Design a protein with these regions (language model features):
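Conserved N-terminal structural module of periplasmic/extracytoplasmic solute-binding proteins
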Residues: 4, 9-11, 22-93, 107, ...
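Extracytoplasmic/periplasmic substrate-recognition and gating elements
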Residues: 47, 51-52, 125, 226-228, ...
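Short helix-initiation/N-cap motifs at beta->coil->alpha
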Residues: 62-70, 89, 154-155, 233-247
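Short helices/loops that flank or line small-molecule/ion binding pockets
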Residues: 68-79, 97, 145, 158-162, ...
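Hinge/lid segment of periplasmic solute-binding proteins
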Residues: 88-138, 148-160, 165, 184, ...
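Short, solvent-exposed loop/beta-turn-alpha elements that line the ligand-binding surface or hinge
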Residues: 105-113, 191-215, 266, 278-287, ...
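Long, aromatic- and glycine/proline-rich binding clefts that accommodate carbohydrate-like moieties
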Residues: 120, 274, 323-372, 379, ...
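Glycine-centered hinge/linker elements that transmit conformational signals in sensory
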Residues: 160, 202-234
């Protein structure tokens, strides 16, 4: 066999947490696009991979949300990456457009990740990516205003009513947007899309008006009907209003994401972070999971080695190093109980909640859900329309928009 050809490549298996493989002798190089200011997190893994596989890995940084758009141009031109990072909500469009190569990863290797995170990179039961980092909603509370967070959403409602009697606020949340209210709707029986016979999403089956969804919205409605929430947190500027009330120490707690940690720290808030509370039926609130993942370009000249790279850098020791360097929460099951995360209040809360979360559907039709769902929630929660009627209207509107979108793509 010629020196400059691939001599041996055996896909790896994990045993006792270690990667077992025969060395691959490869000519050439791999080009990797990493997220901006995140390449330090994979520096050691890249160096070790280069030594073990006798290949040069070129790492270039760029914002992860822009990588797929750049791939559309650079891939066909032959100057694109072998491996890149994308958010899971871009997966569906990328697969439909033929931009990504499927991965071959046995079930045991998939099972080391939290189910929602690995499922986020499946489309029609085919795997296209390996999860790198997750973010999701958590409950953030001011330790100077409430010593211990409450366990249930009902308890938070009761506490918030008492706070209003004193001119203060208890818990605030943007429940008039599906991104935030999903935490109740999903566990109580609603769903965005049903499944098709391939195990993927069926965009013709919209479940936002099911009895469980109506029950959830009816429960959330009392936060507005009994004026536990101020009117100012409704609508497009509601998130800014919530942040202001929390940083001004007028609200004891908020439901928000890790992106709020730094601004709250800058405002001098002595805050704590915990997973979301439980619902009336005792189930914990869910949340939508945002996942960044490593994928392989369809234009990669060595797709097998590109996948080997992704597997290699996601071994536990490299995942831990990546977390320490970047602070991004990894969805590796073994890391949830690792002291480096478990002893970090913020990281632990995000990790635990991520395991309870639902990956946002990555199909293009998801884009047709947000507007009608949010409009129906605002109508319901403000009492302008009955929850069942509002959610029925949203389901009808979503289906109409999806039908129009699909027709325009034919």
């Amino acid at each position: 066999m010629k020196k400059n050809t691939l001599a041996a490549l055996i896909l790896t298996t994990l045993s006792a947490g270690q990667l077992v493989s025969l060395q691959v002798h490869a000519a050439g190089q791999l080009n990797v696009w990493e997220d901006i200011k995140k390449s330090d997190g994979i520096k050691t893994a890249v160096s070790d991979f280069e030594k073990q596989y006798n290949v040069k890995v070129n790492v270039q940084e760029m914002p992860y949300a822009q990588q797929l758009e750049k791939l559309r141009l650079d891939g066909p031109a032959g100057i694109g990456p072998d491996v890149l990072v994308i958010p899971n909500d871009q997966l569906g469009g990328a697969v439909v457009q033929g931009l990504l190569s499927p991965l071959t990863l046995d079930q045991a290797k998939q099972d080391v990740f939290t189910p929602a995170s690995i499922n986020a990179f499946h489309m029609d039961n085919v795997l296209y990516g390996v999860p790198k980092a997750v973010e999701t909603l958590v409950l953030i509370y001011n330790k100077d205003l409430i010593a211990q967070p409450l366990d249930s959403l009902q308890a938070w409602f009761d506490y918030s009513k008492k706070q209003r009697e004193e001119g203060k606020y208890g818990l605030l949340a943007k429940f008039d947007q599906i991104y935030y209210s999903w935490g109740a709707i999903g566990p109580m029986g609603g769903y965005i899309f049903g499944k098709n016979d391939k195990g993927g999403f069926n965009p013709q089956d919209v479940g936002l008006n099911k009895p469980g969804a109506v029950e959830a919205v009816t429960f959330l409605k009392k936060f507005y009907a009994e004026k536990v929430f101020p009117a100012g947190i409704l609508g497009d500027n509601g998130l800014n209003a919530i942040d202001s009330l929390f940083t001004e120490k007028k609200a004891a707690a908020v439901i928000n994401g890790p992106w709020a940690f730094q601004p709250y720290e800058a405002a001098g808030i002595n805050y704590g972070v915990v997973p979301l509370p439980t619902l009336p039926d005792g189930k914990p609130m869910s949340s939508f999971l945002g996942v960044k993942g490593y994928v392989v370009s369809t234009w990669s000249k060595d797709k097998a080695l590109a996948q080997q790279f992704i597997e290699f850098i996601n071994q536990p020791q490299y995942v831990k190093a990546r977390y320490i360097a970047t602070g991004e929460i990894p969805p590796l099951k073994a890391m949830i109980d690792d002291p480096v995360i478990k002893n970090d209040e913020k990281a632990s809360a995000v990790a635990v909640q991520s395991a309870r979360a639902t990956a946002m559907p990555g199909i293009p039709e998801m884009g047709e859900v947000w507007g009608p769902a949010n409009a129906a929630l605002e109508l319901s929660l403000t009492g302008k329309q009955d929850p069942q009627a509002a959610l029925d209207g949203a389901e009808k509107q979503i289906k109409m928009q999806i039908e129009a979108m699909q027709a325009s793509n034919q």
